Amino acid sequence: METFLFTSESVNEGHPDKLCDQISDAVLDACLEQDPESKVACETCTKTNLVMVFGEITTKAIVDYEKIVRDTCRNIGFVSDDVGLDADNCKVLVYIEQQSPDIAQGVHGHLTKRPEEIGAGDQGHMFGYATDETPELMPLSHVLATKLGARLTEVRKNGTCRWLKPDGKTQVTVEYCNDNGAMIPIRVHTVLISTQHDETVTNDEIARDLKEHAIKPVIPEKYLDEKTIFHLNPSGRFVIGGPHGDAGLTGRKIIIDTYGGWGAHGGGAFSGKDPTKVDRSGAYIVRQAAKSIVASGLARRCIVQVSYAIGVPEPLSVFVDTYGTGKIPDREILKIVKENFDFRPGMMSINLDLKRGGNGRFLKTAAYGHFGRDDADFTWEVVKPLKWENPQD
C-alpha cells in the first residue's frame, strides 16, 4: 500500500495574529448586534504594549472600540507584561473611517437594493472543501492540530497546567493512503507543539504534561504507535510570547482558519468582515455545499469554488470537483449544487443568518477554525439535504 505524509498546523488564541483576528471579529459582533446592516472592514495589528484597530466601518451602532480591544485581550489571558501584553495598560489606537461611497453604491445602492440585488463587496474566488475521513467531514491533520491548540487553552484556563501561557502553535503530520480519490488516515506520524510557558517549569515537565493533558485526550489511540514522533517545545525555551514576541495582524492565518492546506484557498481572510464581503460569506456557503455533497453520499471528497465581481449579485462561476469519488458525474453534482444553493451575497446573508452578531458569535470563529465546529451559531455547518437519484448498477 502506497502512503504519503500530509501536515497541518494551528495556533492558539494567544498567538498575536489570532489575537488580531479575535479583536476584529469582536468589533464586527458589536456592530451587527446593534445594527445588522453594518458594513464592517476592521483590521487589527499589535506589537509590544500596543494594539491598533483600523479600517472602514459604516454603522448606526455605538461602539466603544477601546473597551472591545481591552476586553478581548483580557479574556484571552493577556493580563500582564510577562505574558506578552497587559490588557489594562497597553496603548490602544483607533483609526476607523466610513466605507467608501463608491463601494457602497456599487454593492447595495446605499441600502436601496433588495437582498437578491445586493452585489458582491469585491471580486474574488472562494473554496469549500469536505472529506469523509472524520465525523466533522474535515481533514484529520487539520482537526487534530486545531483540537490540540484548543486543548492547550482549556488546560491553561482551568488550571490543569498552570505553567502554560496564552501563545502557542501546534502541528500534526498524518500518514494517508489515497483510495481512488478518498483520503484514508493510517496513523499520526509526527506531533509538534510549541507553547509559551513560565520561567519555572522544566522541559521535562512540559513534555510530560503535554503528552498527558493535551495529546492523549485529543489524538485517538489508534493513530499513535511506537514510531510516532513527538517534538514538544523543540526550541527549548518559549517564555517571551504574544505581541511581545512577534507582531500580529488580522488575516494572516487563513489556512488555519479553513482546511489546513487541503483543498484550495482564494486568498481572502475572514475576520472583521460583514457578510457583504464575499471573502467570508462566499467561503461559508461553499463549505456548506461541499459538506452537504459528502454528507448526502454523493461523493467521499469534494471541493466547490465560487467567484464574484464587485457590485454583481450573481456569481461569475461555480465549480465542483469530487476527485473521482462522485457517485454521479461532477457535472450532475454541479447542477444539484446550483439548484440547492443561492450564491448571491444578499441571499447568503439571509439563508445563513450572517447579519446576526452579538454574544461572541463571530468572535468564536476567530480561534480554532471556522469549519467543522459543532455550534449552532456556525449555520454554514448545517447539512442541507440534497435529492439525487442513484445510478442503476
UniProtKB/Swiss-Prot annotation:
UniProt cross-references to SUPFAM superfamilies, sorted A to Z: S-adenosylmethionine synthetase (SSF55973)
Amino-acid positions noted as binding L-methionine in the UniProt annotation, renumbered to this chain: 56, 99, 246, 277
GO molecular function, one term: metal ion binding
Localization: Cytoplasm
Signal peptide stretch: none
Reactions catalysed, as given in the entry: L-methionine + ATP + H2O = S-adenosyl-L-methionine + phosphate + diphosphate
Pathway: Amino-acid biosynthesis; S-adenosyl-L-methionine biosynthesis; S-adenosyl-L-methionine from L-methionine: step 1/1
Any one Pfam family match given in the protein's UniProt record, by short name: S-AdoMet_synt_C
Enzyme class: transferase
Cofactor note: Binds 2 divalent ions per subunit. The metal ions interact primarily with the substrate. Can utilize magnesium, manganese or cobalt (in vitro). Binds 1 potassium ion per subunit. The potassium ion interacts primarily with the substrate.
Chain sites annotated for binding Mg(2+): 9
Tree of life domain: Eukaryota
Annotated family: Belongs to the AdoMet synthase family.
Protein name per Swiss-Prot or TrEMBL: S-adenosylmethionine synthase
Species of the source: Solanum palustre (Non-tuber-performing potato)
Gene: SAMS
